[in-house]
Amino acid sequence: MKFLKRMAAFCAAAMLTGSAALAQEYDAQQAKSWMEQFAQALSQLAPVNDPAQTLDPARPGEYLQEYEFGTVQAATSGKPTAAQIEEIDVSTAQVTDARGIRVGMTLNEALNGLSIPQTEANLAVLNTQEAGVGWCWAYLGEGGVYGVEWLTYDLTEPVTEYTLTYVIDGDTVSGIRVKAAASTRAQAEAGLATAQEIADKQ
């Protein structure tokens, strides 16, 4: 019962980040705000594993925390702050992401009006941010779309790259991955140039 109450509190806090009825655009401020709210909600939960036992010698300082909704990779075995969270993998509908999307929703709901161009390439750019540095692209295979990814950069030093990825199975979002990583302005601008180059060739 206590766990269910904590999970209910977590879900309530997480869903404050966006309505699942309509997917929103994704920019650095939105990504950063969502991470902060997620970290605050996460502090109400206890992992189902012992994160201290998950330290990978090949990746020192990184711990894997397991929860009912999925996993969190963080730079601590304790309660992580937003800055300490490196990756979130969501496998259930218990978490709403920064764009208002949950696992189980459709590809069309995740795209929110964006269209995937006809291309023989394995990567298709859907749009770029009007302000700031960011873009969205889709991963394409023989079976159609198997992933859609938003990237956006907080260019305030130290520069941070936020990545939001939807794993697509058929026409359904089967997983959501959120990542935050250190970057540079040069890397952000190079990535945007690559996205624009791909878009120009479509």
Enumerate the predicted regions with their spans.
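Bacterial N-terminal signal peptides that target proteins for export
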Residues: M1-A8
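Bacterial N-terminal signal peptides
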Residues: F10-G18
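Sec-dependent signal peptide cleavage junction
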Residues: S19-Q29
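A cross-family detector of function-defining hotspots
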Residues: D27, Q40-P80, L107-Q187, G191-K201
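Short, aromatic-enriched amphipathic alpha-helices that serve as compact interaction elements
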Residues: A31-F38, Q94
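Short, compositionally biased strand/turn segments
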Residues: T81-A93
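Second-shell loop/turn segments in exported
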Residues: Q94-I101
